Amino acid sequence: MNNIFSKLRDFVGLNEQVEYEYYEEEADTDNYQNLYQQENPQPAPAEAAPNNRRWREPMTTMGDDVATGTKSAMGNVIGMPGAINGISEVLVLEPRTFEEMPQAIQALRERKSVVLNLTIMDPDQAQRAVDFVAGGTYALDGHQERIGESIFLFTPSCVQVSTQGGVIHEVPQPPARPARPASTNPPAWGNETNRMAQ
């Protein structure tokens, strides 16, 4: 029985002897001062030796300075593409094949609006392309609108779409928090002094 366990340990590798490598280093006596036999102490240098430590200087990005006009203390914040300069971009795509559709999704991820002109595509491929981009737009909380025959507008969630008749898609604003009124009633547990917590 013991033989089976030893074979199992050998197979798994638990019986192997661990070999440690030992290094013997000679002491570098040139860098040490002999404190006990110092008869003629050396004069202290006029200038202290520079530290070998590397200090990290605070860095600011050009985008932070441009957006706020001042240097920002939060240099590690990375903004959304196109959000710093406030310029909205619209990408017009006229794809010939379905393989060009990931470009539209990437543009939506970069907060760009996409006008998709599918007039030169095969109708079956065009339907597949619209379904693909519409699914990506939905996943990114965007909006889609049909502009004309085989022409579609896909926008990210930060773009408000409107027509002459009114707003089709409005950018949601964060709800305002209602202020909590101060309670004038004292707590019920504060009046009972003879009760003990269990």
From Swiss-Prot:
At the top level, the lineage of the source is Bacteria
Keyword Transferase assigned = no
Q: Which GO terms describe its cellular component?
A: cytoplasm
The record's keywords, sorted A to Z, are: Cell cycle, Cell division, Cytoplasm, Septation
**Protein role:** Cell division protein that is part of the divisome complex and is recruited early to the Z-ring. Probably stimulates Z-ring formation, perhaps through the cross-linking of FtsZ protofilaments. Its function overlaps with FtsA.
Assembly and partners?
A: Homodimer. Interacts with FtsZ.
Q: Which InterPro entries match?
A: Cell_div_SepF, Cell_div_SepF/SepF-rel, SepF-like_sf
Q: List the disulfide bonds.
A: none
> In this record, what's one Pfam family?
SepF
- BP GO terms, sorted: division septum assembly; FtsZ-dependent cytokinesis
Please name the gene that encodes this protein: sepF
Q: Residue ranges of region Disordered?
A: 170-198
Q: Which family does it belong to?
A: Belongs to the SepF family.
Under Gene3D superfamilies, the record lists:
SepF-like protein
Name listed for the protein in its UniProt record: Cell division protein SepF
- Quote the biased-composition stretches of kind Low complexity, using this chain's numbering: 179-188
Q: Where in the cell is it found?
A: Cytoplasm
